[in-house]
C-alpha cells in the first residue's frame, strides 16, 4: 500500500514509451482534472543519453576538475563495468516543468545532490538511486553548477587579529572601525523626537503630491501617506536630526529647502507596476534564486536592488494575500495519490507460448519469430541464453533481445548492464582499426562507434563487402561521341561537384540518333604492341647518316673508338628511350680518328 502511494516531493519513474527507458521526474503538484483524472506537475531530470556529446564532454571535464581539487581518485579504483554503470546513475536537473498523467507512474526512485565526501560506490550499491551535480537548460543547451562556491579572499573573509593579552590596550583607531549615527543621550525627549518624525512624514506626503511620477503611482492621499511613513523617510529624518546636533529648527529647514521638500523613495516606489509583475512571475518560477531572477527576468536591475525589493515586498498586503491564496490552494489540492501496480504486458514482450510470435517494438504488422533460447540469440547485455521472459530491443531489423533482468535495468537506468564493444574500444583502443588494410573490412557500425549486434555465437560479426563492377551501356558510349560539345568531359572532370545536364544530352542524342543510326560506332585507336614495333624497325632500319671525319692533329696520337649499336632487346625490357634514341643516333656507328 505504501509503495503505491505517491506524494508531492517524491521522485518517480514515468513511462512514455514501451521501448524507451523510464523518465525520472519529481512530483511538484497533484491536480485533479475536470474529467476526474489526476495529473502530476513534475520537474524534469535528464540522463546522459538525452543531451549532446559536447555537453557530456563538459560534464566529464567538470567532474575531473572537482576530483583534482578534492585530491581524491574517485574512478581509479573502479572497474570498467562499475564505471559504465556509474554513468547510468548520473542525472541533470532542469528548471523545466511538465504535466503528465499520474497513471503513467511506474515506481519510486531516489535522486540526491552529489556528495563529494561520500563514495560513489554507495550509489551503485543502492537500487533506484541517482545523483546530479549540474543543471541542464533544454532551450539554451547549457550546463550550470547547481550549488554555489565558497568565496575565498579578503573581500569575503575577515582578517582576524591576534588575541590581546590581559591588560593590553587596543591600539586600533575606533573611528575607522565604526560610525556613530545616533546618540541616545540627546537633549531632546522622546515626545519631541516623535513630533519631528510626524513633521517628516507630512513633508514626505507633500513632496509626493508635488512629484508627477509619485502622484501617478500613489493617486490617493492615503497611499501617499503610507509611502511617506516607510523606513527610508524615518531614517533620513533621524539622520538629519543627528547631523544638526538635535536642533529642531535647523533640521526642519533642511527637510524643506528652497527648491522644495525632500523626497525619499525606496525600492518599492522606484519599481514600476510591470517590473513588480515580472518579479512575482519570476519568484513563482525560480523561488528565491535571485541570480536566475535577475538573469532571465530583470537584467537591468542590480542584485542588491532585487534582494531589497523582495524583503520590502514581503511586508506588503499583496504578499499576505498571495500567501493566503496559496494556502487555500494547497488545502484544495491533492497531497497524495494511489496508483496500483501496472500489470499489463509490454508490447515488446516476446511471446513463446503456443507458438505465437511476439510484436517487435510494438509495431503493427511487424513480428519477431521466437527462437529457442538455447540455440537462438543471446541477451545483448549479459549474453545469457536462458530467461523466463524475453523482450525485443533495438531496431526491428536487428532482431536483438534482452532477458528480463537486463530489460528492467534498461528501463530504469537507460543503458545496458555490460559495456558494449564501442565503449571498450574507447577505454582501450585496438590498433587493428587503424590499419587501412583492415579498416576496409570493419563493419559500418564499429567504424561509427555504434554497438555491434551480438548474435550469441563466437563468430565475428564482421562481413566482407560485396563485390561489384560498373557496366557502361551502349547508349552511354554512343552519347560520349555524339554529344561531345555538350558533354565536355575534360571540363566536367575538373569540376567534379558540378552536376552534368543530362536532359540536354538526352535531347541532343535524340535529335542526332536518327541521322547517325546507320553509322558504326567509332572505336578508340589502340596502340600496337611493342614486339610489333621492334620487328618493324628490324625489317626497315633507319638510314645511316654520312660519316663525320675529324681533322688529324699533330700533338695528339691517332685513336679509334667504335660506337656500338644498342641492342633492341634492352629497349623492350626497359620500355624507355634515352636522349640519343629520340634524336636518331641509335643507329649511328662511326669511328672518330685524328
From Swiss-Prot:
Give UniProt keywords alphabetically: Cytoplasm, DNA-binding, Metal-binding, Nucleus, Phosphoprotein, Zinc, Zinc-finger
Q: Which residues carry this modification: Phosphothreonine?
A: 455
Q: Where are the zinc fingers (GATA-type)?
A: 379-406
Q: Gene encoding this polypeptide?
A: MTA3
The protein's induction, as recorded, is: By estrogen.
- Entry annotated with the keyword Metal-binding: yes
Q: Which domain of life is it from?
A: Eukaryota
Residue ranges annotated for the BAH domain, each copy included: 1-147
What Pfam families does its record include? BAH (PF01426), ELM2 (PF01448), GATA (PF00320), MTA_R1 (PF17226), Myb_DNA-binding (PF00249)
What does the entry state regarding organ or tissue expression? Answer: Expressed in germinal centers of lymphoid tissues. No expression in nonepithelial cells.
Task: Give start and end of each SANT domain.
Answer: 266-318
- Family note: Belongs to the metastasis-associated protein family.
Q: Which residues carry this modification: Phosphoserine?
A: 428, 430, 519
Cellular component terms (Gene Ontology): cytoplasm; intracellular membrane-bounded organelle; nucleoplasm; nucleus; NuRD complex
Question: Which cysteines bridge via disulfide bonds?
Answer: none
> Quaternary arrangement and interactors, per the entry?
Component of the nucleosome remodeling and deacetylase (NuRD) repressor complex, composed of core proteins MTA1, MTA2, MTA3, RBBP4, RBBP7, HDAC1, HDAC2, MBD2, MBD3, and peripherally associated proteins CDK2AP1, CDK2AP2, GATAD2A, GATAD2B, CHD3, CHD4 and CHD5. The exact stoichiometry of the NuRD complex is unknown, and some subunits such as MBD2 and MBD3, GATAD2A and GATAD2B, and CHD3, CHD4 and CHD5 define mutually exclusive NuRD complexes. Interacts with BCL6. Interacts with NACC2. Interacts with PWWP2B.
Q: Which Gene3D superfamilies match?
A: 2.30.30.490, 4.10.1240.50, Homeodomain-like (1.10.10.60)
Please list the coiled coil stretches. Answer: none
What is the name of this protein? Answer: Metastasis-associated protein MTA3
Q: Which GO terms describe its molecular function?
A: chromatin binding; histone deacetylase binding; protein-containing complex binding; sequence-specific DNA binding; transcription coactivator activity; transcription corepressor activity; zinc ion binding
| SUPFAM superfamilies hit by this protein | Homeodomain-like
Amino acid at each position: 500500500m505504501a509503495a503505491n502511494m505517491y506524494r508531492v516531493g517524491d521522485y518517480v519513474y514515468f513511462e512514455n514509451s514501451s521501448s524507451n527507458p523510464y523518465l525520472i521526474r519529481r512530483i511538484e503538484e497533484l491536480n485533479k482534472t475536470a474529467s476526474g483524472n489526476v495529473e502530476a506537475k513534475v520537474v524534469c531530470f535528464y540522463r546522459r543519453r538525452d543531451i549532446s556529446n559536447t555537453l557530456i564532454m563538459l560534464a566529464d571535464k567538470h567532474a575531473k576538475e572537482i576530483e583534482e581539487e578534492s585530491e581524491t581518485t574517485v574512478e581509479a579504483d573502479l572497474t570498467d563495468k562499475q564505471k559504465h554503470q556509474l554513468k547510468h546513475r548520473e542525472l541533470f536537473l532542469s528548471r523545466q516543468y511538465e504535466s503528465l498523467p499520474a497513471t503513467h507512474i511506474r515506481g519510486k526512485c531516489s535522486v540526491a545532490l552529489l556528495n563529494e565526501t561520500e563514495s560513489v560506490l554507495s550509489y551503485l550499491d543502492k537500487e533506484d538511486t541517482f545523483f546530479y551535480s549540474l543543471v541542464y537548460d533544454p532551450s539554451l543547451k547549457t550546463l550550470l553548477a547547481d550549488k554555489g562556491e565558497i568565496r575565498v579572499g579578503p573581500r569575503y573573509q575577515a582578517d582576524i587579529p591576534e588575541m590581546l593579552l590581559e591588560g593590553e590596550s587596543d591600539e586600533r583607531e575606533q573611528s575607522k572601525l565604526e560610525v556613530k549615527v545616533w546618540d541616545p543621550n540627546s537633549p531632546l525627549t522622546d515626545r519631541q523626537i516623535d513630533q519631528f518624525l510626524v513633521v517628516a512624514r507630512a513633508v514626505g506626503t507633500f513632496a509626493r503630491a508635488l512629484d508627477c511620477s509619485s502622484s501617478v503611482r500613489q493617486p490617493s492621499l492615503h497611499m501617499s501617506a503610507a509611502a511617506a511613513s516607510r523606513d527610508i523617510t524615518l531614517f533620513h529624518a533621524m539622520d538629519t536630526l543627528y547631523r544638526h546636533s538635535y536642533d529642531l529648527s535647523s533640521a526642519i529647514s533642511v527637510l524643506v529647502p528652497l527648491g522644495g521638500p525632500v523626497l525619499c523613495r525606496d525600492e518599492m516606489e522606484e519599481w514600476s507596476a510591470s517590473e513588480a509583475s515580472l518579479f512575482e512571475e519570476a519568484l513563482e518560477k525560480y523561488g528565491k534564486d535571485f541570480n536566475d531572477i535577475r538573469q532571465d527576468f530583470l537584467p537591468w536591475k542590480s542584485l542588491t536592488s532585487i534582494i531589497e525589493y523582495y524583503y520590502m515586498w514581503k511586508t506588503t498586503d499583496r504578499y499576505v494575500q498571495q500567501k493566503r491564496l496559496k494556502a487555500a490552494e494547497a488545502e484544495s489540492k491533492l497531497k497524495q495519490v494511489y496508483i496500483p501496480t501496472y500489470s499489463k504486458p509490454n508490447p515488446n514482450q516476446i511471446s513463446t507460448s503456443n507458438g505465437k510470435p511476439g510484436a517487435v517494438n510494438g509495431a503493427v504488422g511487424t513480428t519477431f519469430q521466437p527462437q529457442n533460447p538455447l540455440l537462438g540469440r543471446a541477451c545483448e547485455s549479459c549474453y545469457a541464453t536462458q530467461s523466463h521472459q524475453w523482450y525485443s530491443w533495438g531496431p526491428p531489423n536487428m532482431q536483438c533481445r534482452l532477458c528480463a533482468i537486463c530489460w528492467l535495468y534498461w528501463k530504469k537506468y537507460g543503458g545496458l548492464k555490460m559495456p558494449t564493444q564501442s565503449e571498450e574500444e574507447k577505454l582501450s583502443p585496438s590498433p587493428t582499426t587503424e590499419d587501412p588494410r583492415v579498416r576496409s573490412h570493419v563493419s559500418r557500425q564499429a567504424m561509427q562507434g555504434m554497438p555491434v549486434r551480438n548474435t550469441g555465437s563466437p563468430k565475428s560479426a564482421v562481413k566482407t563487402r560485396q563485390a561489384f563492377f560498373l557496366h557502361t551501356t551502349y547508349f552511354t558510349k554512343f552519347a560520349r561521341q555524339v554529344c561531345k560539345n555538350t558533354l565536355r568531359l575534360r571540363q566536367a572532370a575538373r569540376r567534379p561537384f558540378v552536376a552534368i545536364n543530362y536532359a540536354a544530352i538526352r535531347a541532343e542524342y535524340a535529335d542526332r540518333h536518327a541521322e547517325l543510326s546507320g553509322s558504326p560506332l567509332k572505336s578508340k585507336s589502340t596502340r600496337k604492341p611493342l614486339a610489333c614495333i621492334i620487328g618493324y624497325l628490324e625489317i626497315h632500319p633507319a638510314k645511316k647518316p654520312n660519316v663525320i671525319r675529324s681533322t688529324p692533329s699533330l700533338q695528339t696520337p691517332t685513336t679509334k673508338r667504335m660506337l656500338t649499336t644498342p641492342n633492341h632487346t634492352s629497349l623492350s625490357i626497359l620500355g624507355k628511350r634515352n636522349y640519343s634514341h629520340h634524336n636518331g643516333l641509335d643507329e649511328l656507328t662511326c669511328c672518330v680518328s685524328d
